[in-house]
Amino acid sequence: MKQIQTIEKGANFSAADFGRLADIKDYVLELAPEVRIPGKVFGGGAVGATGSEFSFQVFAPGQETGFLHTHRTHEELYFFLSGKGEFQVDGDVFPVGEGSVVRVAPEGRRSVRNNGTEPLVMLCVQYRGNAFTAADGADGDILNEPVKW
């Protein structure tokens, strides 16, 4: 089973390597001894994320999640990095592919499938819904310091 590699850690950062997108299929997420999801890996813990979780997942042609799910508090953003498929939210089905981004509220009943001929690779970011305010959009500060390469 493929493992996440630590690149570097510091007081204010951590970096990890998940490998090539083509190799995401080699990860296996074990939810319980009898529940294994091939081609999925969560990464928030590997980088010490404190306000979100994320996962990479790959679906082979014809593969789907096989279930609908919701969240109690987490909104999700799905970024489709390659391939083609379909996404379903609350019974609405629509096409997704490389460059598509889907936001789903916690209550949205969601599922995804690959109806294409190539692997469908996605990055899912989940975070507490309704927590981001207009003021958060101006949270960044540009520093008057040289960049050291």
What residues fall within each predicted segment?
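A short, N-terminal "cap"/entry segment at the start of jelly-roll beta-barrel domains
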Residues: 1-51, 135-149
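Conserved short histidine dyad/triad with adjacent acidic residue
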Residues: 35-42, 55-71
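Short strand-coil-strand connectors
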Residues: 50, 88-92
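Short, conserved beta-strand element in jelly-roll/cupin
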Residues: 56-60, 70-88, 125
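A generic structural motif
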Residues: 63-65, 75, 82-84, 107-109, ...
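Ligand-binding loop in jelly-roll beta-barrel domains
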Residues: 86, 106-132
